[in-house]
Amino acid sequence: MPTINQLIRKGREKKVRKSTAPALKCNPQKRGVCTRVYTTTPKKPNSALRKVARVRLTNGIVVTSYIPGVGHNLQEHSVVLIRGGRVKDLPGVRYHIVRGALDLAGVKDRKQGRSKYGAKRPK
């Protein structure tokens, strides 16, 4: 516990909060080009083939990002929109690709939670 004199001399130091998505550089989303589209396996208790892509952003940073939803039309040189948000069971994946934006199509036949997967309202 500091004395009043110590507080006058030094003051309290503000805690600096580290960003969870540093490659976005304080932007809500960033555009990028896919350099590699592949599947990975998740961490220990889970088992699957998760779809991910290596993306070179417009600021030159290369990140690994997750492709949400069932099925996708991404390939090398596809232009995508990246948002923050990590995938808990994939180490090193701290970004999501936005469905229904730029080259990535929305999820087909999606009935619920459509806005998160870029699906239009079914007729």
Curated annotation (Swiss-Prot):
With S4 and S5 plays an important role in translational accuracy. Pfam families: Ribosom_S12_S23 (PF00164). PROSITE patterns: RIBOSOMAL_S12. HAMAP family: Ribosomal_uS12_B. Belongs to the universal ribosomal protein uS12 family. One of its GO terms (molecular function) is structural constituent of ribosome. Transmembrane segments: none annotated. Part of the 30S ribosomal subunit. Contacts proteins S8 and S17. May interact with IF1 in the 30S initiation complex. GO terms for cellular component: small ribosomal subunit. One of its GO terms (biological process) is translation. This is Small ribosomal subunit protein uS12. Gene3D superfamilies: Nucleic acid-binding proteins. The modification 3-methylthioaspartic acid is found at residue 89. Keywords: Methylation, Ribonucleoprotein, Ribosomal protein, RNA-binding, rRNA-binding, tRNA-binding.
